[in-house]
């Protein structure tokens, strides 16, 4: 009976793990100086997401590469963040984030644009399930800083529902204001 339950738990865990996509962003060889010399190990940076709006990143260190990747993946799954996507494919609004000397600017993009982003940011967007986004990184190109800056920006992303609740307005009122503020709205009305 207990063995059957244990097997079922393992199957559930494997099923949960299979829904996630993990991307290895960076591997670094690190050294610890000890009395007898240097002890070498590896550090891994991994991004994990379900391609439905949840994403996380993790850092793992170990003597062997596969063990470092496994630790980083587990850390990423523990720190998943939900991001509200517009139409399930892009951001609701432009947003910027920073961490250390790394700064990123994320812009919502029209359908068919694709993911225009470099290096570590691309891994985050692919794991998130985002299809259309334009991103620019400024300052530091360190993958750790870029990933953290990207997550900082994504945490600042708000859905119209969240903004309306915070302001005490209806979502339709916000969307009407957005349509009025779009460039070219006056030209379309005049025609």
Swiss-Prot record:
Q: Where are the transmembrane segments?
A: none
Annotated protein name in UniProt: Small ribosomal subunit protein uS5
What are the record keywords, sorted?
A: Ribonucleoprotein, Ribosomal protein, RNA-binding, rRNA-binding
Gene Ontology MF term list: rRNA binding; structural constituent of ribosome
Q: Which InterPro entries match?
A: Ribosomal_Su5_D2-typ_SF, Ribosomal_uS5, Ribosomal_uS5_bac-type, Ribosomal_uS5_C, Ribosomal_uS5_N, Ribosomal_uS5_N_CS, Ribsml_uS5_D2-typ_fold_subgr
Q: How does it assemble?
A: Part of the 30S ribosomal subunit. Contacts proteins S4 and S8.
Function statement: With S4 and S12 plays an important role in translational accuracy.
Chain spans, region Disordered: 162-191
Q: Which Pfam families match?
A: Ribosomal_S5, Ribosomal_S5_C
GO cellular component assignments: small ribosomal subunit
- Classification lineage: Bacteria, Pseudomonadati, Pseudomonadota, Alphaproteobacteria, Hyphomicrobiales
